[in-house]
Amino acid sequence: GIMNCDKNDMIQEFEEKPAHPKSNLASMGIYIFNTDSLLEYLEKLENSDLDFGKHVIPSMIQEDRKVYVHTYDSYWKDVGTYDSYLEANLDLIKKSEEVGINLYDQGWKIYTRTG
């Protein structure tokens, strides 16, 4: 989702996959919730698909709940497709020294999973 925030990082608008984005602040899909608030929304929206970007977050914002962002300014790559997964791996190879990763360190483990 794409969002707009105020000066205190409180989300004012959240739109999932907009045709014409109003900002370049994108959700990484990682959320932290107060348990009671989340359970309340899951119960309220139980007959929907319960997609966080389409239902839960926009509903909370619409009801003036306090929803904030944490701006992450390092490398992040959506790896939801084979092409983007390949691109992320190529980025790792190209930028390993830049980010302080030694790919030739025998003690550094790389974990991956398919399916």
State the predicted function of each range.
Residues 36-37, 43-115:
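Left-handed beta-helix
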Residues 1-36, 43-45:
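Conserved core of the sugar-phosphate nucleotidyltransferase
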